[in-house]
Amino acid sequence: MTVSIAALMIGRSALLPDGKRSAIAKHPLAGPVRIGRLGLDGDLQVDKRHHGGPEMAVHLYPFAHHACWREQLGDHPLLADPGAFGGNIAVDALDETQVRIGERFRLGEALLEVSQPRMPCATIERRFERKGMVAAILESGRCGWYFRVVAEGVAQAGDSLVRVTDSGSEITVRAVFMALANPSGAADPALLERLATLPCLAEEWRDKAIAKRRRAGG
């Protein structure tokens, strides 16, 4: 699997319409950027309790999802921006159904590994000034995902995102999200057991699987 990168993006602290600060708005870079253990150089996180760190170093939110959002939000001006949902990588031809936890991708000189789905938060609704967006993501599974950085390196727009190793797991980002974040997600005991012990899945999501398994009496 090889997909072309339309843009690499970083965010700075800025005021949201409600007056609170966030770095969710990501803007395309004009040249190469170093991708380190904590993400792209210059990319900031204001809410470090819920964002950032090695397991959430690089975020990809599929730009193709913006078309679905237009059906819900209309022609919202933010939907023209590839970084509107906080993503660092803009691609069209890739989504949560095609990417599996633990898969590794080469991006320029950097090596990335899929670590977890992205859990939506209210910052999205505050940025767009629209209620119901978090619930829509939870129901639809259009969540995006995070990479951890296995090997640091430089990349730029126009490079390709190339899958270089199979995770050995058939579990897609969407499957994890729908099982553990979707309110209607069924408590499949076998899947919960698998997720609870899947080493390449970020610890926070393994803990979600353990908790759901306990609630289900497993």
Each model region followed by its residue ranges:
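Loop/turn positions that initiate beta-strands
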Residues: 102, 152, 157-159
